[in-house]
Design a protein with these regions (language model features):
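Structured, active/binding-site neighborhoods that engage oxygen-rich ligands
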Residues: 1-272
Length: 272
């Protein structure tokens, strides 16, 4: 039986929050280090990677782990709130007019801070860029993402764009590319578009994994498309990611990854 759009939306948003809460504890660490820390893969709620989380990384004194969601879920919720307010499709201008004001003006519970605070006080530098450029710099929202760290910062919260465009991957891609222009550029912006398209394809009645992959490949450009193709080809020979699966997938994506295997030690070609 086909899923309803309500079920698809609930599953996407709740699932992303649960995944965020499970993975947040180990974010930024390699699979080998994660498995050493937790005596295997993460199968449920785990404590912080660093027991002394307040001081282990002073630049990010967040209580990751123990089931706490991160800024991924916070930003996703803010985007849902924007849709609830405007009741229409979004553009980059809506990021300036509706999303940023929420980041700097709406106090809410921030689990990782163990306090009520502004979302601005939890998001990291690539998301603070939104406030700097749009609220203080008055930059054209359609171009504000240029110069920011090119990363997954926009991708992490565009699932609602895919849901609003359920069954229309091309529409989701176009809307996410526009919205993400206020935050990201280059392959960071492209990733947001392709991810939203994948969610839109997955939200269609009776959607299959093949449908999602095909929709993503039909819209992805340049290195993003090549990377997806490489990973899909590698994954087709696997029964799952456990065992040697992670290494096979990592080998497939490595040629396209300018960051390098160690997340906080960029490769020589990391500069744009």
């Amino acid at each position: 039986m086909a899923r309803s759009i309500e079920d698809a939306a609930t599953g996407a948003l709740a699932g992303s929050a649960v995944g965020d809460a499970l993975g947040g504890a180990a974010e930024g660490n390699t699979p080998a280090v994660i498995q050493e820390r937790y005596d295997g893969t993460i199968e449920g709620i785990v404590p912080p990677f660093h027991a002394d989380w307040r001081t282990a990384r002073p630049i990010a004194p967040y209580h990751k782990g123990d089931g706490h969601v991160t800024d991924d879920t916070l930003m996703t919720g803010l985007l849902v709130d924007v849709y609830a307010e405007v009741r229409r499709h979004l553009t980059a201008h809506d990021v300036a007019d509706h999303l940023v004001p929420r980041m700097i003006g709406e106090v809410r519970w921030i689990p990782e801070l163990e306090a009520e605070a502004l979302p601005l006080q939890r998001v990291f530098l690539a998301e603070k860029w939104l406030v700097t450029r749009l609220h203080y710099g008055h930059v054209d929202p359609r171009e504000a993402g240029v110069g920011n760290v090119v990363n997954c910062g926009a991708t992490m919260y565009v699932a609602p764009i895919g849901l609003v465009n359920a069954g229309d991957p091309a529409g989701a891609y176009a809307e996410a590319i526009d919205v993400a222009g206020a935050h990201q550029s280059s392959y960071g912006r492209e990733a947001a578009g392709v991810f939203a398209a994948a969610v839109a394809a997955a939200a269609a009645p009776d959607a299959t994994v093949t449908d999602v992959v095909d929709a993503s490949l039909a819209l992805a450009k340049d290195g993003t498309r090549a990377a997806i193709e490489a990973v899909v080809e590698a994954a087709s020979s696997l029964d799952g990611w456990r065992g040697d699966g992670l290494a096979v997938l990592r080998d497939a994506v490595r040629p396209f990854d300018t960051v390098g295997d160690a997340y906080r030690q960029p490769a020589m070609d990391a500069r744009l």
